[in-house]
Amino acid sequence: MDSRFVTYFASAISASVLVTTIFVCWNVTHDLNTLQAMSDRNMQDFKAISDRTWDKMMFKQQSSPPSPSLIFGRNKRSGDKCNCSEEPSNCPGGPPGPPGEKGNDGVDGVDGIPGFPGENGGAALDQPADGTCIKCPPGPRGPPGPQGEEGPSGDVGEDGEPGVPGNDGADGTPGKSGAPGGKGPQGPPGTPGRPGQPGRKAIGEAGPKGPPGAPGTDGRRGENGTDGDDGVDGQPGDEGDAGKDGTPGEPGPQGEQGTEGQPGTDGAYCPCPARSISKVAIQ
């Protein structure tokens, strides 16, 4: 019994360790795949940003204005010109060249840096023309213009017409039964039914005891009862307090004379001689 329990316990631990290992391996593989996908996406974003930056640099280089030396310089030009007189400075230009091809939609550019301060203005180089104008033949047709810049965003188009109503959808599944409805209003009284068959006389069982009836009226007053017997004598009460002293009584009658008293003792002035019976008798 003990060996079998140990075997089952070891098998359970091995199975749990195996499942945990498989889960950890799958989690690590998933994290690596996620990291690789994020790296590829970042590389694609970086490549797209670098391509757009390179296109902007090329476009800026092609559409950059000429240098100040080309604007303010005095470069001589040779070619077909009017040799009849001095070359005027106010001849009309040739016809405009054909419009260039429509440029591709460019990407949104980044905000440019603030421009440098402009140079101080100088005196105009053109000489004022005199009253006489020598009309020269128009110059040759100019070359096609450079590719135009990206046009502004077009206005929002108008709302399209409402589409054709769709087909009716399929019938939905029956809904759950609703809660019982409230009690409806009382209907009108029905028509009286036909009289029933005569009933058979039957004696039913006694019904349950009914509730108590109402109290009856008061009865007549009863006659007076006979006198009761005398009660038993009560026990003597506690001893009362002493009464007050009475008034003094009247003096009683005078009493009879008493018998002669015994001889008294000697005085304290001096001792007397003893008395004899005969002397006492004489006195």
From Swiss-Prot:
Disordered: region residues: 59-283
Keyword vocabulary terms for this entry: Collagen, Cuticle, Disulfide bond, Repeat
Ranges where the record places region Triple-helical region: 94-122, 139-201, 204-269
Entry GO terms, CC: collagen trimer
InterPro entries listed in its UniProt record: Col_cuticle_N
Keyword Repeat tagged: yes
Transmembrane annotation, as ranges: none
Low complexity biased stretches: 253-265
One GO MF term: structural constituent of cuticle
Biased composition (Acidic residues): 226-240
Residue ranges with Pro residues bias: 137-146
Job description of the protein: Nematode cuticles are composed largely of collagen-like proteins. The cuticle functions both as an exoskeleton and as a barrier to protect the worm from its environment.
Family: Belongs to the cuticular collagen family.
PANTHER family named among the record's database cross-references: COLLAGEN, CUTICLE COLLAGEN 79-RELATED
Complexes and interactors: Collagen polypeptide chains are complexed within the cuticle by disulfide bonds and other types of covalent cross-links.
Protein name: Putative cuticle collagen 79
